[in-house]
Amino acid sequence: MYGGKSAEHNVSLQTALAVTKALNTEKFDIHPIYITEKGEWQRGPLLTEPVSNVKMLQLEQNGESFALSALNREMFPEASPDEKAPIDVVFPLLHGPNGEDGTIQGLLELLNVPYVGNGVLASSAGMDKVIMKHLFAQAGLPQAKYAAFLKKDWKQTPDSCLQQVEKELGYPCFVKPANLGSSVGISKCRNREELEKAFELAFEYDRKIVVEEGIAGREIEIGVLGNDEPKCSAVGEIAPKTDFYDYKAKYEDGDTDLMIPAQVTDEQYAEISEMAIKAFKAIDGSGLVRADFFLTNDGQVLINEVNTMPGFTPFSMFPLLWKEAGVDYSDLIEQLVELAKERHAEKQLIKHTF
């Protein structure tokens, strides 16, 4: 399931392209569900061979529209005309609001369909940077200083917002929409003029934003895989050649060095992996997250954020980290499918009467 009515629609398409190429069509029957940028749902024909380009995944022309009022019947048809097998697992490859924020996960929960990745709570907490940071603070995880603002506050008292940032965080700082990923709408600010423009830009994408102090150090990432007993991958380092790791560097020109494995000490790896699992549990994660850290110039490890649906594009860090740990791309996908089935089976044992 991919696409979506989101600023990260194209990111989702790139992720879906990579995943469909890696899936073993002899082992899996792949049914594409495409959500257009207008929010329309299209079901495509069974994929019998790897998809070669993104246009083949955009199903406006060769897909079949269906209404959400008939989800059980139309969205998940029989696996084939000759058998009554239900869909085994849904793999949501949706990024951003309405995709990795718990909404699609809630829909799949209502349908009682197994799905890959985090549940409603973890997805929504992982999408909202403000809530995420509150949970990290409660879990005792060290992180950069931050402040949150609503669009209402900005419109009513802009000077007060700017003064609060300057007093509590200083420059440089980063302004981000609270509920968006892939570095969309993010700005680095070195002065008040840039800060004011950054507020305006971020509020174009969300009604709530977060401002974080700038941290001098390295950007370190690690993959987490599992349910109640998660494990960690190798660590990687992001070294953007631009001022910071923005959307263009992530998905377009690849103008970023990904160093895998990152050069860290055994003690630092142990601390990063321990904090990553602690962050995973703080949001009640399942399936997968990519945990992002800062390693400051004085050696301190700070949690930045977790991504509950990290990209699977050719430039993406998550699958590369697991490849370094000895898990290839196809095997990684199969493990995620098994984790989804495991978590779903566990939920079926829960009592709903008393």
Swiss-Prot record:
- Alphabetically ordered keywords of this record: ATP-binding, Cell shape, Cell wall biogenesis/degradation, Cytoplasm, Ligase, Magnesium, Manganese, Metal-binding, Nucleotide-binding, Peptidoglycan synthesis
Please list the residues that bind ATP: 166-221
Q: What Gene Ontology cellular-component terms does the record carry? A: cytosol
UniProt domain ATP-grasp: residue ranges: 133-338
Check the record and name the PROSITE patterns matching this protein. ATP_GRASP (PS50975), DALA_DALA_LIGASE_1 (PS00843), DALA_DALA_LIGASE_2 (PS00844)
Q: Which cofactor does it need?
A: Mg(2+); Mn(2+)
Q: Which InterPro entries match?
A: ATP-grasp (IPR011761), ATP_grasp_subdomain_1 (IPR013815), D-Ala_lig_Van_CS (IPR000291), D_ala_D_ala (IPR005905), Dala_Dala_lig_C (IPR011095), Dala_Dala_lig_N (IPR011127), PreATP-grasp_dom_sf (IPR016185)
One example GO MF annotation: D-alanine-D-alanine ligase activity
UniProt record, GO biological process: cell wall organization; peptidoglycan biosynthetic process; regulation of cell shape
Q: Which NCBIfam families match?
A: D_ala_D_alaTIGR, PRK01372.1, PRK01966.1-2, PRK01966.1-4
PANTHER family in alphabetical order: D-ALANINE--D-ALANINE LIGASE, D-ALANINE--D-ALANINE LIGASE A
Regarding protein family, the annotation reads: Belongs to the D-alanine--D-alanine ligase family.
Record's protein name: D-alanine--D-alanine ligase
Instruction: Identify the species of origin.
Output: Bacillus velezensis (strain DSM 23117 / BGSC 10A6 / LMG 26770 / FZB42)
